[in-house]
Structures are given as structure tokens and as C-alpha cells.
From Swiss-Prot:
EC number: 2.3.1.46
Name of the molecule in the record: Homoserine O-succinyltransferase
Positions annotated to bind substrate: 221, 352
Enzyme kind, highest EC tier: transferase
UniProt keyword annotations, A-Z: Acyltransferase, Amino-acid biosynthesis, Cytoplasm, Methionine biosynthesis, Transferase
AB hydrolase-1 domain residues: 46-355
Subunit structure: Homodimer.
Length: 385
């Protein structure tokens, strides 16, 4: 039986120890916004870390007081759900460089007394994982029972297995890739140019100028959203349906798919109030992710020290991070005789499928989480039901 997580309150960890970053820059101090769900058991062995994707944040489940919107993965986290909060203590933090409570471009730079803006240092998946490890230490958790993430979150999971192999028992990598393709880097560059050429961007100092590059953000989101959807899904959802039932022979919105994309862009740029500099940072972190680069471009070698057990999930119509990209990860793990489970899930929803309801996906996910719970309690899967 499933139930819902109720009202949640975000927490904040202030870290006064400087963070040495991959770029060579240093954050003198920083805040990490995070949320937790469920209860930590006596030996603190049931903790799960969720790593979010590009536009995500730490609000992964439940809802805030006075708000109706639920967390971005609420369908999969809660009592009786695949990530069962009756069994697990779930943690999710907002990535550094974000705009939802963790230190980012809109935060005050303690060295200048002004907002960081474009001066915020470039962040990488490795930087995020090292800050998340600081949160782990703060929570006095010896090791995560599992680290779980989809898309960019899956990249962080892989980085965890490389940088902190003794602190992660299971790694669940969903709809992800070991590095971006040239095409994906190109999509990110077009999105960045849309933002940076908006007259309201002001070289990233738009907060000081009292503006917001909404047009650029909306265009970037429209492009990104296109890559998250499959052709089949767009065809079945919109086809060539006209908004007014007839052609008007002008450049206003005529097709329903145009209306949908404009709505998604405007919502992201206005209602969600996403910081433009954060968007630039997140896309760059995606571009830079390539753990094999430090191991002679050999992914098998990069993952050779990983001791976690793995679940890798891909989706048939995901062309942003196609199943073939997951196969690369699977092969590298098999080269190392890793304990690995793999599922390729049928879905018409493209890359966004990892966020949406799907019986096959949920079944695989639920079964694997039951396995983790059974291992924690030293029981068989039947006893661990």
C-alpha cells in the first residue's frame, strides 16, 4: 500500500571549509540545501542519496506548506513506493551552482559582498560529489545503501563509485551516459548562446542590472525540452493539430506543438524563476563529464576500483542518452566482473521517461530496492517483502 509524504521543510548545511574545485578555483565557504524523508535506522545503514538532473533540485518528494506542487520524483519516493520511506532514509541536496538554496551565482560572494553572478566558479560532477560527501559526513553516515540518479544525476552516481567506492554499496544509474556526445554538447552550446545573446543577460550581471534574460532562458528550455521528448510521443500527443483548427498564414502560434513548447519555455523562465547563470553552469558540467579522460580514455579502467553493485536502466526511445550509451557503461562494468543488473524499458516518452509512471520501470526499480532492503536486514527477498 502506498501513501504520500506530507509537508516537508528544506534544511541547510553551512560548510566553512574551503572547497578546492576541479577548475582550480576555490569556494571559501558554501551552503548546501537538502531535504530528507523517512528515518535513519540505528546503525545508519539505510541511507539513500538522490542526485538530481539539470533543472532539478533537492525538493524530490512531498510538498511545502501552502503549496500544491509535489517534488519532482514524488511518484517514486514515499511510503510503499519503489524508494520506500518506511524502509529507507532518503537524502537529496541541491547541487552547488544551483538556484534553489545551495550556494550559486545568485548568492553573495563573501569576498566582495556582491552576488557572484558570472564570477561563480565552473562546477563539475566531481565537485558536486565531493560536496555531497561533506553532507554525508555531516549526517554521520558511514556509507550510502545506494546512490541513485537519472540523466545528469546518473553521472554523479558514476562519479561516486570512482571517487568514494567505500561509501556506496549500490549504484543506480538511470537514462544516463559516461560522457556527452558531440551532438549533446552542440545542443548545450545553442542553449547557452540563446541565453548569452539575450540583451537582458548583461554578461551575466543581470541581477545588478535589475533584469532577467527571460527570452534566452525560454529559448534554451524549448530546445532542451525538445531533446527530452521522443518523436513518437510528440506525434501521438500533438501530430499536426492546429491550435485554432485552421491555418492563419502568419508567424504566430498555429500548431499545438508550438504552443506547448512556448508554454514550457515561458513557465521555466518566469514561474520557475531559474537562474540563467545556473543554467550555463549546469550545461557546462554536463559537457565536462568524462571520467575516463583521467584513465587513458578507458572507461573500464575508470570503473575498475568501483566496489558497488549496479543497476543500469535505459529507455528505448531516449535519443538524448540512448540505450547504447548505457551499454557502454554495462560493458565497462562487465570488463571488471562487477555485480550488475541491466534493464532496457519500453517507453514512448523519450529521455523524460525516467521521471514518469511506467509499470515495467517501476517493477524493475521496486524489485531492486527490495533486494537492497533484504541485504540490509540479512534476509531473503521473500522475507524482505
Amino acid at each position: 500500500m502506498t501513501d504520500e509524504i506530507g509537508i516537508v521543510t528544506p534544511q541547510k548545511l553551512h560548510v566553512s571549509t574551503p572547497l578546492e574545485m576541479v577548475s582550480g578555483s576555490t569556494l571559501p565557504e558554501y551552503d548546501l540545501a537538502y531535504e530528507t524523508y523517512g528515518s535513519l535506522n540505528a546503525d545508519k545503514s539505510n541511507a539513500i542519496l538522490i542526485c538530481h538532473a539539470l533543472s532539478g533540485n533537492h525538493h524530490v518528494a512531498g510538498q511545502y506548506e501552502g503549496e500544491s506542487t509535489r517534488g519532482w520524483w514524488d511518484g517514486y519516493i514515499g511510503p510503499g513506493k519503489p524508494i520506500d520511506t518506511n524502509r529507507f532514509f532518503v537524502v537529496c541536496s541541491n547541487n552547488l551552482g544551483g538556484c534553489h538554496g545551495s550556494t550559486g551565482p545568485a548568492s553573495i560572494n563573501p569576498l566582495t559582498g556582491k552576488v557572484y553572478g558570472p564570477d561563480f566558479p565552473i562546477v563539475t560532477c566531481k565537485d558536486w560529489v565531493h560536496s555531497q560527501n561533506t553532507l554525508r559526513q555531516h549526517l554521520e553516515i558511514d556509507a550510502w545503501a545506494a546512490v541513485i540518479g537519472g540523466s545528469m544525476g546518473g553521472m554523479q552516481v558514476l562519479q561516486w563509485t570512482i571517487d568514494f567506492p567505500d561509501q556506496i554499496r549500490h549504484a543506480i544509474v538511470i537514462a544516463s551516459a559516461p560522457k556527452l556526445s558531440a551532438q549533446n554538447i552542440a545542443f548545450n552550446e545553442v542553449a547557452r548562446r540563446a541565453i548569452m545573446t539575450d540583451p537582458d543577460f548583461h554578461d551575466g550581471r543581470f541581477i545588478e542590472a535589475g533584469t532577467t534574460p527571460k527570452r534566452g532562458l525560454a529559448l534554451a528550455r524549448m530546445l532542451g525540452h525538445l531533446t527530452y521528448l521522443s518523436d513518437d510521443m510528440m506525434g501521438s500527443k500533438f501530430g499536426r493539430e492546429l491550435r485554432e483548427g485552421k491555418l492563419n498564414y502568419n508567424f504566430d502560434v498555429e500548431f499545438q506543438v508550438e504552443s506547448y513548447l512556448r508554454y514550457q519555455g515561458e513557465k521555466f523562465a518566469t514561474k520557475q524563476n531559474f537562474d540563467a547563470n545556473t543554467y550555463l553552469l549546469m550545461t557546462k558540467a554536463l559537457d565536462y563529464f568524462d571520467p575516463a579522460a583521467d584513465f587513458d580514455d578507458d572507461l573500464s579502467k575508470a570503473l575498475s576500483g568501483a566496489t558497488a553493485k549496479f543497476l543500469i536502466i535505459s529507455f528505448t526511445t531516449d535519443w538524448r542518452f540512448s540505450p547504447e550509451r548505457s551499454h557502454e557503461i554495462v560493458k565497462a562494468l562487465l570488463d571488471n566482473d562487477a555485480d550488475i543488473s541491466y534493464a532496457e524499458v519500453n517507453s514512448q516518452h523519450g529521455h523524460d521517461a525516467f521521471l514518469l509512471p511506467n509499470d515495467h520501470y517501476e517493477g524493475v526499480f521496486r524489485a531492486y530496492m527490495k533486494r537492497i532492503h533484504a541485504e540490509l536486514n540479512h534476509t531473503s527477498l521473500q522475507e524482505g517483502e
